[in-house]
Amino acid sequence: MSRWLQETGGTPGASYNQAFRDLAEAGVDVHGEAAYVAALIGPGSLDAGCGTGRVGAELARRGHVVVGVDSDPWMLGEAPAVPGARWVLGDLDAVEDVAAYDLVVAAGNVVVFLADGTGPSVLARLARALRPGGLLVAGWRTERAEDDGRPVLAVAEYDAWCAAAGLSPVARHRGWAGEPWSDDADWCVAVHQRPDRAGA
């Protein structure tokens, strides 16, 4: 069971979505993740840990063909019906590793909510789901975040998972608007790439 389900017991997806609707009504751009990744590569995308489908739906609106996978049925139940997007209930450690995607995005702290001890195997599976040259983009709270009881993940640990999965670092930012990275950042957006060919 993912840490997300252990800690939340399943989140009412409607209230999660409402929080983002409120932000949008206040003028906040709630599609930073989709804007960031849509500009990188296209168009076949896996939204890993898609939750209510907020990022995946926006990617579909921007022309991507998206498969969203999440283990929380309450969150997934709120995912919108959008042409070009398909939502699947399932665990990330069971994602088919078929080299089918140009892009795998794990936004919104997905990597910190993986079941304990599964990070390396999940990252390896997501790496194998990428086509050669494909990108894995993840965003999460780092070990530099305020200690408020919410989970964090050390950047070095995530990098080690990616390296073990055969992924190479491409870029790192402190936010979805591409803010320059600094070692004291409490948020990380990391881009890693699968080699273009075997052994590359």
Listing of model-derived features with the role each one plays in the protein:
Residues 1-51:
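Conserved class I S-adenosyl-L-methionine
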Residues 52-94:
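Class I SAM-dependent methyltransferase SAM/SAH-binding core
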Residues 93-103:
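A short acidic, Gly/Pro-enriched loop at the edge of an enzyme's catalytic core
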Residues 102-117:
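A short SAM/SAH-binding and catalytic strip from SAM-dependent methyltransferases
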Residues 120-132:
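A short glycine-rich, Lys/Arg-flanked "PGG" loop and its adjoining helix->strand segment in the class I
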Residues 133-141:
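Conserved beta-strand signature within the Rossmann-like core of class I S-adenosyl-L-methionine
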Residues 151-166, 172:
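Short alpha-helix
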